[in-house]
């Protein structure tokens, strides 16, 4: 088609150079370019689709263990058979929800390499760039910028590599003036009426933390468009479960999930897919 530019050529283990082919509105021309690096080639290969490979209907390519076929073939067979056959066929969680949960869990456990493998598959299966960014942004409130930043920069590279322009459309719904009020209302909606004015409670020396919870975590993030309340609570549930050491917080958010419609069976299906 007109105005399309792409490149093609030999595999990365070949000495052949790749070609960039430009197709202007009128006519066509070829431009000889230098070899494509392994990194560029890998980015292209990461645009994956579900494949009926090795009898595993849920398998993607590459997988989180791609690259180990020569050194650890038995492990690869065990892992792929379990993850892409046994696990994906357990329960009836839709693919979009499954991949959103997996991305959140990989953030929680700091699996950045695996995140980079799974993100293109998630995009291919219908998870939108906006949803990806909202998962990443919300993770900051629970995991901290030190843990989220590498995921965010890698996600930006993947999104741009697939042709998505950045920044994406703004999703904020609050202002500096109303973020506390709306954040506290989000707490009430999720956890119950006892959260009304919770940011005013607690010892004076640490009360500011309750305020930050209301205005930043809930006012800045939970009120954003792009994910609904049920999706956001599922994300938080996955962040906390994968991070570990957050038992009380995990129990609290499990209750919040159930309160807004993510019932016990749904949470079991979600956590099963994150295993």
Where are these regions (language model features)?
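Acidic, glycine/proline-rich low-complexity segments that act as flexible tails and inter-domain linkers
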Residues: 48-97, 109, 116-124, 148-229, ...
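Glycine/small-residue-rich hydrophobic helix-like segments
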Residues: 228, 232-237, 241-265
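Winged helix-turn-helix DNA-binding recognition segment
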Residues: 127-131
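Double-stranded beta-helix
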Residues: 7-47
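Preference for long, well-ordered alpha-helical segments
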Residues: 147, 249, 264-275
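Substrate/cofactor-recognition hotspot
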Residues: 134, 140-146
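Short, structured motif recognition centered on aromatic/hydrophobic residues
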Residues: 97-106, 133-136, 231-241, 270-274
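Short acidic-glycine-tyrosine-enriched beta hairpin
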Residues: 1-3
């Amino acid at each position: 088609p007109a105005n399309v530019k792409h490149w093609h050529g030999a595999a990365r283990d070949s000495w052949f150079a790749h070609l960039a082919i430009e197709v202007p509105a009128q006519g066509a021309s070829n431009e000889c370019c230098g070899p494509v690096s392994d990194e560029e080639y890998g980015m292209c290969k990461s645009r994956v689709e579900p494949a009926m490979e090795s009898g595993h209907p849920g398998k993607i390519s590459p997988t989180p263990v791609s690259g180990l076929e020569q050194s650890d073939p038995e492990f690869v067979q065990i892992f792929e058979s379990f993850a892409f056959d046994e696990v994906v066929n357990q329960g009836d969680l839709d693919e979009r929800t499954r991949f959103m949960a997996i991305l959140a869990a990989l953030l929680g456990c700091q699996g950045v390499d695996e995140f980079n493998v799974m993100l293109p598959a998630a995009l291919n299966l219908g998870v939108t760039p906006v949803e990806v960014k909202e998962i990443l942004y919300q993770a900051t409130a629970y995991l901290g910028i030190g843990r989220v930043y590498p995921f965010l920069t890698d996600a930006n590279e993947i999104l741009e590599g697939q042709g998505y322009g950045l920044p994406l459309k703004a999703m904020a719904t609050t202002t500096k003036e109303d973020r506390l009020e709306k954040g506290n209302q989000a707490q009430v909606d999720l956890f119950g009426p006892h959260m009304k004015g919770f940011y005013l409670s607690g010892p004076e020396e640490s009360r500011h933390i309750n305020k930050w919870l209301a205005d930043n975590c809930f006012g800045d993030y939970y009120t954003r468009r792009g994910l609904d309340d049920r999706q956001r609570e599922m994300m938080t549930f996955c962040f906390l479960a994968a991070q570990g050491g957050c038992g009380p917080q995990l129990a609290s958010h499990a209750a919040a999930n159930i309160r807004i419609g993510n019932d016990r069976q749904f949470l079991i299906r979600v956590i099963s897919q994150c295993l």
